[in-house]
Every structure is written in C-alpha cells, then in structure tokens.
Amino acid sequence: MSAPRFRNGTFKRTLKRVPGGRKVEHYKKKKPSKHVCAKCGKVLDAVPRGRPYEIRKLSKNQRRPNRPYGGMYCTNCTKEIIKKEARSL
C-alpha cells in the first residue's frame, strides 16, 4: 500500500515498469494552475506554468513578457493602466 502522504489528490500517479518486470506506482506533484490577470482574471499568455524548479531553469525573458506589468496584467488591462497613468500626469 502507498505511504499516507501519497494518499491524496496532490500527487499524480503513473505506473512504471521496473527492470525486474514489476509495475510500480511513481508519484509526481501536479503542475500549478495557469497564471491569471490580477485585474480581470483572464488567463495570461506567454507565462509558462510549471513547478518552481522548472521555471528556475528558464532564462529571464522566457519566464514572463518583457513589457511593463508583464506577467501581472493581460494586454488589455495593461493598455488601460498605461493610459490612466499618462493622463494623470
């Protein structure tokens, strides 16, 4: 039987065949949910989804868009925020 820490929905289960011919269950943590816009809640494009150790391996410009508020707001909300800032000057 699996260890108590694996008996929940946190882990993804996969069957692997080991060299001895047996099938064993391997456990892997699930991917985190997709990033969403902080203002409207729309799913963000160009922001990868993965565990922190996977994201750490990417270069800085692969982690998020290189523009103001990249990775926080969607393009439409970013446009609105920039317009509002420019008009308040």
UniProtKB/Swiss-Prot annotation:
Stretches the record annotates as Disordered: 1-29
Basic residues compositional bias, start-end: 13-29
Biological processes per GO annotation: translation
Pfam families to which the protein is assigned, alphabetical: Ribosomal_L34e
GO cellular component: ribonucleoprotein complex; ribosome
Keywords assigned: Ribonucleoprotein, Ribosomal protein
Keyword Ribonucleoprotein attached: yes
Keyword Ribosomal protein: yes
GO molecular function annotation: structural constituent of ribosome
Domain of life: Archaea
Family from the record: Belongs to the eukaryotic ribosomal protein eL34 family.
PANTHER family in UniProt: 60S RIBOSOMAL PROTEIN L34
Name of the protein described by the UniProt record: Large ribosomal subunit protein eL34
Lineage: Archaea, Methanobacteriati, Methanobacteriota, Methanomada group, Methanobacteria
